[in-house]
């Protein structure tokens, strides 16, 4: 590679395109995974340079490889390297391509999602319908199972509560979601003046438990941000770390308003009857049950107005819509393989030995693969 990237500025590297593909931007997602934070700065430029060089080699390889002779291409995730380059290149060349990754399961089982968009976005065709009594019961059971090992939330004051829920800042879903704010931390920074202005309210920060899970252990999480900024923030705040077992749903139930970045807590808050504002764009923010915004300015203006007017009311229709959306996401999109999954060490999995000879109650992919070859919908419900 003859190009001397050492002379490029950090911004030039971030926006560098090669043969119509923004390899600079696509590198950011994977670098975030390497450094375990969304805060990619100038001193990370060596990661960026090496990643761009790798992307160029992949694109040159694909141009000289007869991939058009294949009926379809399946790639993992679609947002991380090197698969994101393959995904983008196939789309640019009108090659049938889809992504796969672990999906959601209302049975809390191992599941596989197939999607024509990058699978971490979890985009699907939502049927805006009311759930049956049986479906509502299943959804309630799913949520209740998630809170079994939680400990009670006890507010230290009688002030009205505004809760703030973070996410795993460097997760692959963040790159495509962060188009209102540059990152989750920029959003948190912007909340400080509002917190200080509303001392009659208690602001409860809750770090995402995923920050503490072995496979997603975060080196700089919400708790670290809170500790580093504590001197700038008024005393009307408390923060629960990722390893704290406090019941997040109990926090929601005791809140007047929930502020989320892009986690599914946004959906669950509405289901529990608590109004929520989303600070990033994600798979559920354009459905209608949660408020989302095109810019940080619009977000902050709406938040201030909501707090000033105490506009915390929520329509039952939105609660029903959120429940319907969540149920469909959990049960009609991904394919369950729970019965043939065998857990190994460190979040690894394999198939049980008898998966080919014994009868298991799992979702089959025969028709799905035919749908893929015909470029038909890939969701389980089809």
Language model regions located:
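Donor nucleotide-activated moiety binding/catalytic core segment of transferases
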Residues: 52-65, 178-179, 216-267, 271
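C-terminal amphipathic helix plus adjacent low-complexity
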Residues: 118-123, 128-159, 298-382
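Active-site-proximal loop/turn and secondary-structure-junction residues that shape catalytic pockets
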Residues: 103, 168-170, 209-211, 245, ...
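Conserved nucleotide-sugar donor-interacting segment of glycosyltransferase catalytic cores
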Residues: 58-112
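Conserved N-terminal ligand/cofactor-binding loop architecture of enzyme catalytic domains
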Residues: 1-56, 102-146, 346, 355-358, ...
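Conserved catalytic-core segment of nucleotide-activated headgroup transferases in glycan assembly
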Residues: 141-228
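A donor-sugar binding/catalytic signature common to diverse glycosyltransferases
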Residues: 76-78, 82-87, 110, 243-291
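Catalytic or ion-translocation cores adjacent to nucleophile or general acid/base/metal-coordination motifs
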Residues: 96-120, 278-305
């Amino acid at each position: 590679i003859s190009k001397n990237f050492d002379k490029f500025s950090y911004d030039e590297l971030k926006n560098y395109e090669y043969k119509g593909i923004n390899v600079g931007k696509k590198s950011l997602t994977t670098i975030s995974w390497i450094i375990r934070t969304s805060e990619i700065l100038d001193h990370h430029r060596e990661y960026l340079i090496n990643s761009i060089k790798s992307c160029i080699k992949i694109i040159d390889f694909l141009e000289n490889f007869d991939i058009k002779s294949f009926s379809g291409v399946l790639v993992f995730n679609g947002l991380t390297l090197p698969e994101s380059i393959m995904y983008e290149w196939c789309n640019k060349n009108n090659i049938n391509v889809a992504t796969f990754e672990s999906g959601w399961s209302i049975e809390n089982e191992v599941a596989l999602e197939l999607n024509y968009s990058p699978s971490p976005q979890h985009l699907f065709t939502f049927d805006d319908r009311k759930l049956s009594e049986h479906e509502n019961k299943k959804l309630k059971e799913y949520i209740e199972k998630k809170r079994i090992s939680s400990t009670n939330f006890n507010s230290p004051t009688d002030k009205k509560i505004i809760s703030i829920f973070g996410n795993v800042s460097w997760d692959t879903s963040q790159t495509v979601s962060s188009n209102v704010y540059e990152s989750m931390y920029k959003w948190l920074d912007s909340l400080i003046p509002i917190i200080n202005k509303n001392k009659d309210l208690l602001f409860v920060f809750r770090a995402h438990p995923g920050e503490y899970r072995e496979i997603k252990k975060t080196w700089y999480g919400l708790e670290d941000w809170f500790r580093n900024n504590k001197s700038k923030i008024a005393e009307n705040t408390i923060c629960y770390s990722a390893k704290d077992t406090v019941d997040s749903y109990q926090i929601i139930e005791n809140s007047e308003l929930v502020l989320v970045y892009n986690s599914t807590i946004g959906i669950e808050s509405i289901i529990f009857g608590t109004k929520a504002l989303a600070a990033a764009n994600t798979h559920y923010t354009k459905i209608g049950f949660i408020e989302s915004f095109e810019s940080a300015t619009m977000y902050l203006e709406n938040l201030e107005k909501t707090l000033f007017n105490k506009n915390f009311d929520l329509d039952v229709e939105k609660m029903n819509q959120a429940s319907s959306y969540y149920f469909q996401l959990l049960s009609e999109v991904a394919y369950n393989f729970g019965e043939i999954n065998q857990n190994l060490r460190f979040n690894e999995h394999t198939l049980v030995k008898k998966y080919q000879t014994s009868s298991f109650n799992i979702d089959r992919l025969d028709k799905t693969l035919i749908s893929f070859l015909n470029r038909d919908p890939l969701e389980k419900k089809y």
